[in-house]
Amino acid sequence: MENFKLKIKKEDKVKVLTGKDKGKIGKVLKVLRKKNRAVVENINVAKIHQRPTQANPQGGIVDKPMPVDCSNLMIMCNSCIKPVRVGIKQLEDGKKVRICKSCNEQIDA
């Protein structure tokens, strides 16, 4: 696998475009660059059977969010409050920031 240049980062608010969780909005917990996937909070949740350990002596069935392909996610813009395409703009000081394609506002905090 090759590394992809992803525009989705950890802590981003994203909307799911396709699949069983279509239309849901969640926060990105983890980005898997090599697999072009992201783990999103409360999206694509699977039930995992966990055996008892010292940390969790009870064990049992646990809900765990599984990775979603990044092509099925779209970043939510904070200013226009809708899913948008993302562009990259270079500031005068040379720093690159992500911008919303529809309102040209900066997405990065």
Curated annotation (Swiss-Prot):
Q: Name one GO biological process term.
A: translation
Q: Gene3D superfamilies, from UniProt?
A: 2.30.30.30
- Name the SUPFAM superfamilies for this protein: Translation proteins SH3-like domain
**Keyword Repeat part of the UniProt annotation:** no
A molecular function (GO) term: rRNA binding
- Give the source's domain of life in one word: Bacteria
| UniProt GO cellular component terms | ribonucleoprotein complex; ribosome
InterPro entries in UniProt: KOW, Rib_uL2_dom2, Ribosomal_uL24, Ribosomal_uL24_CS, Ribosomal_uL24_KOW, Translation_prot_SH3-like_sf
Q: How does the record describe its quaternary structure?
A: Part of the 50S ribosomal subunit.
Provide the function of this protein: One of two assembly initiator proteins, it binds directly to the 5'-end of the 23S rRNA, where it nucleates assembly of the 50S subunit. One of the proteins that surrounds the polypeptide exit tunnel on the outside of the subunit.
* Family to which the UniProt record says this protein belongs: Belongs to the universal ribosomal protein uL24 family.
Q: What is this protein called?
A: Large ribosomal subunit protein uL24
**Organism for this UniProt entry:** Desulforapulum autotrophicum (strain ATCC 43914 / DSM 3382 / VKM B-1955 / HRM2)
- The organism's lineage? Bacteria, Pseudomonadati, Thermodesulfobacteriota, Desulfobacteria, Desulfobacterales
